[in-house]
Curated annotation (Swiss-Prot):
The chain crosses the membrane at residues 15-35, 43-63, 73-93, 104-124, 140-160, 186-206, 219-239, 255-275, 282-302, 307-327. Residues 25-154, 198-326 form the EamA domain. This is WAT1-related protein At4g08290. GO terms for cellular component: membrane. Belongs to the drug/metabolite transporter (DMT) superfamily. Plant drug/metabolite exporter (P-DME) (TC 2.A.7.4) family. InterPro entries: EamA_dom, WAT1-related. The keyword ATP-binding does not apply. It is a multi-pass membrane protein. The keyword Repeat applies. It is found in: Membrane. Pfam families: EamA (PF00892).
Amino acid sequence: MEGVSATMHKLRPYLLMIFLQFGAAGTYIVIMATLNQGQNRYVVIVYRNLVAALVLAPFALIFERKVRPKMTLSVLWKIMALGFLEPVLDQGFGYLGMNMTSATYTSAIMNILPSVTFIIAWILRMEKVNIAEVRSKAKIIGTLVGLGGALVMTLYKGPLIPLPWSNPNMDQQNGHTNNSQDHNNWVVGTLLILLGCVAWSGFYVLQSITIKTYPADLSLSALICLAGAVQSFAVALVVERHPSGWAVGWDARLFAPLYTGIVSSGITYYVQGMVMKTRGPVFVTAFNPLCMILVALIASFILHEQIHFGCVIGGAVIAAGLYMVVWGKGKDYEVSGLDILEKNSLQELPITTKSEDDNKLVSSISDNSNVTIPGGAHSNTSGI
């Protein structure tokens, strides 16, 4: 019995991350279904982030009551900027691009997020790069490979891949319709998704700065969602003036904000943070390509989306680039941990307890890390 318990304890992080990827895949599906029903994307964003703020706020008030720092004008401006970058720009561009392409395509493109974050952090001198080191080469090459995969998906669609549950007549009809439409829609949709990805990466960079002066994860995430809901509401009032556009019924228009607010922000935030504490951000990010596969299968079955050969090839290339970047970043964490451990062994008294050493090591690594990999401990997890 103890052996079974020990095995389940070892498997728990893997099972939890697989569960989260199913939840993330569901986000793409329900959002796409809502957009297909004609719901304005900014109305969806308002409801989604409002639900997320309501879900996170009680936990923030209870668990961070004694550790929440005082709000300053500087932190407030950063929170407003974070709410504009992630909910307004990222989700706004991402949803529009998804509507022009597909949920499968969007989930594949979004795997270049770590690469884009690396580029922005490097430009801002927040990411150290040494060409002589293998880990830096891995991050650079992985970034180029990921961008190359996105380029392949943009320029090459390729033939349709027949699936056992697909309807050949429907695939032929949809393919004919797509050929008759302006191909620029596909390119424009890709550019919009990439713009959303850049905004999301900028969000992670700014969040890594903000968390140093406001180290209350739950409170910060709740405030970001609230700021995003308020700013999205202002945009939505301009683009959607008819009251009927704000109406929700017992369909995807009601289910989408509830699902994304509770699952994508509430449950995902808690589970992701719990796994990150024991296995690190690289472990969390490494499961992202599974979401792409799940979206492709579920969307083709429920939404009758087509899967093109170019999407498969490009997605595989992007996934390869993703793993190269997270491998290089993982080596950064290992080196950082060894440096801190060596420094502590030289500066501290030789007699300490194991728990004190562990706490100092974790605290030091947290204080000296640069930009958290997307999906890490400081992730708001309320993206697309």
